[in-house]
UniProtKB/Swiss-Prot annotation:
Pfam families: Aminotran_1_2. The lineage of its organism: Bacteria, Pseudomonadati, Pseudomonadota, Alphaproteobacteria, Rhodobacterales. The modification N6-(pyridoxal phosphate)lysine is found at residue 248. This is 5-aminolevulinate synthase 1. GO terms for molecular function: 5-aminolevulinate synthase activity; pyridoxal phosphate binding. GO terms for biological process: protoporphyrinogen IX biosynthetic process. The keyword NAD does not apply. The active site is at 248. Substrate binds at residues 21, 137, 156, 363. Pyridoxal 5'-phosphate binds at residues 189, 217, 245, 277-278. Belongs to the class-II pyridoxal-phosphate-dependent aminotransferase family.
């Protein structure tokens, strides 16, 4: 068996289809976000503006967060020293979980090494805890949810994205006598559309189903205290399990679930992804807790974030660019093929100092390739002007279609 030949075949297929992924070597600079330094393959450096990061609010640079991390580092050192069960639970972890439980109005929270692991571990474990559990999942749920459900081996059904009639049809076919969990998201990251939380809860409640929501692209950014779209809409108490991240709006690292004390205790006790993973370093837990605590009160930062997203959408729409606008902070621009998508991304970086990663299959379906911009409160008007002008030039250069602009 020629193993290298098999690997070459797989990699060459990606190159041929124009969707081979390259890593851009960048260095974030303290206090300069969204500016960063790009180290080119030849070793030279160029200052760029990051337009595709997940540090949605710039909290990864916030003095409150950095101060908490410096204090914890000086106090405890680098790593946690173990799993949560064996010497790896510290005061910092307990404080963070208390902040998260309070954020979502739940009895408890459980911190994982990432939101991916939190989804995967929880969804793969629940069918072991609840015999006969059937999971009903939105078609566009994140890969971590899909993988967790797959690994559980339980009976599963997929309903059409945000389609309430299809959800009801599936639940009716399962019946009211079986345990059911309905899994969905609040903000779907590739299109930026919102999950139909209230209506899904209404239908799920008719069948006595548990509700599991992924708020990864919403926590910190929506709701009076940053509890997500469910908080914004006054629906947190109707959700049984909330999944979130500490690596996007909160600007640090890690993931979690928030739920009842009994639910968190059961997952803590049975999920291999929690039990056998080294816990977050105390310095990370301290920074995350400080960020969560700060954003509970920083309404102005959230409002500015939404304002910048609206401005960017309006400016790009004014050029006739095909924006996918569902009202969230995510700004996808539809390109429609992987070659042009990567070409525009490369030219933005090389010629304009603008970094946005192309989004290609399998992250999105073929023919829906896009550039996905994530404006933040610290992307100022000059940066927006520069981006809009660059997109205008490159869209014309690539002879891509524009929509008619109504005056």
């Amino acid at each position: 068996m020629d193993y290298n030949l098999a690997l070459d075949t797989a990699l060459n297929r990606l190159h041929t289809e124009g969707r081979y992924r390259t890593f851009i070597d960048i260095e974030r600079r303290k206090g300069a976000f969204p500016k960063a330094m790009w180290r080119k393959p030849d070793g030279s450096e160029k200052e760029i503006t990051v337009w595709c990061g997940n540090d949605y609010l710039g909290m990864g640079q916030h003095p409150v967060v950095l101060g908490a991390m410096h204090e914890a580092l000086d106090s405890t050192g680098a790593g946690s020293g173990g799993t949560r069960n064996i010497s790896g639970t510290t005061l910092y972890h307990k404080r963070l979980e208390a902040e998260l439980a309070d954020l979502h109005g739940k009895e408890a929270a459980l911190v994982f090494s990432s939101a991916y692991i939190a989804n995967d571990a929880t969804l793969s474990t629940l069918p072991q805890l609840i015999p006969g559990l059937v999971i009903v999942s939105d078609k566009l749920n994140h890969a971590s949810m899909i993988e967790g459900i797959r690994r559980s081996g339980t009976e599963k059904h997929i309903f059409k994205h945000n389609d309430l009639d299809d959800l009801r049809r599936i639940l009716t076919s399962i019946g009211k006598d079986r345990p059911i969990l309905v899994a969905f998201e609040s903000v779907y990251s590739m299109d930026g559309d919102f999950g139909r939380i209230e209506e899904i809860c209404d239908i799920a409640d008719e069948f006595g189903a548990l509700k599991y929501i992924d708020e990864v692209h919403a926590v910190g950014m929506y709701g009076p205290r940053g509890g997500g779209v469910a908080e914004r809409d006054g629906l947190m108490d109707r959700i049984d399990i909330i999944n979130g991240t500490l690596g996007k709006a909160y600007g640090v690292f890690g993931g979690y679930i928030a739920a009842s004390s009994k639910m968190c205790d059961a997952v803590r006790s049975y999920a291999p992804g929690f039990i056998f993973s080294t816990s977050l370093p105390p310095v990370v837990a301290a920074g995350a807790a400080a960020s969560v605590r700060h954003l509970k009160g920083d309404v102005e930062l959230r409002e500015k974030h939404q304002t910048q997203a609206r401005i960017l959408k309006m400016r790009l729409k004014g050029l006739g660019l095909p924006i996918i606008d569902h009202g969230s902070h995510i700004v996808p621009v539809h390109v429609g093929d992987p070659v042009h998508c990567k070409m525009i991304s490369d030219m933005l970086l090389e010629h304009f100092g603008i970094y946005v990663q192309p989004i290609n299959f399998p992250t999105v379906p073929r023919g829906t390739e896009r550039l996905r911009f994530t404006p933040s409160p610290v992307h100022d008007s000059g940066m927006i002007d520069h981006l809009v002008k660059a997109m205008d030039v490159l869209w014309q250069h690539c002879a891509l279609n524009r929509a008619e602009v109504v005056a």
